Amino acid sequence: MLKIQPARERRAGGKKLALALAGGGPLGAFYELGALHALAEAIEGRELTEFDVYVGVSSGSLLAGALANGIDTTAIGSSFIHDEATIPFSPDTLLQPALSEYLGRMARLPQSLAALGRQFMREPLQGWPGVVGSLSNVVPTALFDNRPLERYLHEVFSSPGHSDEFDRLRSRLYLVATNLNTGESVAFGDARHSHVPISRAAIASAALPGLYPAVKIDGEHYVDGALIRTVHASLALEAGADLLICVNPLVPYDASGVRGKRRRNLAEEGLPAIMGQSLRALIHSRMHVGMASYGARFPGADVLLLEPDRHDERLFFANVFRYTGRNRLVEHAYQRTRRDLLSQADQLSRALGRHGLTLNRQRLRDRRRTFATAGEERAARVRRTARRLDHALHRLEALLAQGRPRA
């Protein structure tokens, strides 16, 4: 669904563009990839890799870091979906057991048992609650290791033409994490934290407690940035954004039933479905409170919000760890976003036009387009441009050679 919050005031110029990407785990990242690809081909006048400000939270930090580095959605798709990139991505990267965490916690067991024994001697009738409390520091804090993801991101961002340093980017990039010991949000990429590698900041922003361990940076431990706020879009607006596009992949699933379909009872779907729905409800309600305040706080900015439909069963129950699941989810998000953009084309065109952008309606109406074919078309345009540039360089070299004095 597309929600448009037009500016209450008009500012001169008005061409500073920003993109804010919320989190949502692997599922959210693949949804955002499809939605962003639809945006990239529909909006003309500026590439998504040419925006002025990027904000990433949780899994959104991975995509924000890539776009700020000039890596477009076609290249991201080649890596994440088709395994065709120079540095391909495997979902196994996200599921490596946190062995060092397990071993480190086990090493504490003798000391904890000794402390428990001393406590039992003092209070022999304390019961099981006291035992469990005494051994809590032995329980691993995470299931999976986020260091393989950090190594992958560092390799990608350090490749030729890119950078793993905030200060070397053309645009401003903010990746938001939560300080575990203070409960405060930290925006890596601001003046105080721009020395941190982008790859390190990204895994800190995406360190969901229980799944991934907290990330230590400058003596502090950081976890998922969505614990405090969902999108942190105000960072982009405070940086002077005139047009802000937000993508939020997590909305509560409405299981009340779509016409012609049997109602699904989430209570029967197991713990992951119940926890997922609870998290979505919390994140979504909190985000809309923040979005509602932007009109008064930043009256000169147009704000666009893209979200999935609440009845989208395919998105809620998708399995992103299977190749077909990833491919279908990205394609599904791509087509749904194209539909949403076209359904509000008139209002969207006016909002984009205020910032020197246009909406390609013909491309949105083309039902033959898919995520894959759109990517191939975009790659073909890049190749044609590269060939023209190569031809121009050869001609320039020939002209320079003709002008050189002979020995």
What are the residue ranges of the model-derived segments?
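Patatin-like phospholipase
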Residues: 1-57, 62-407
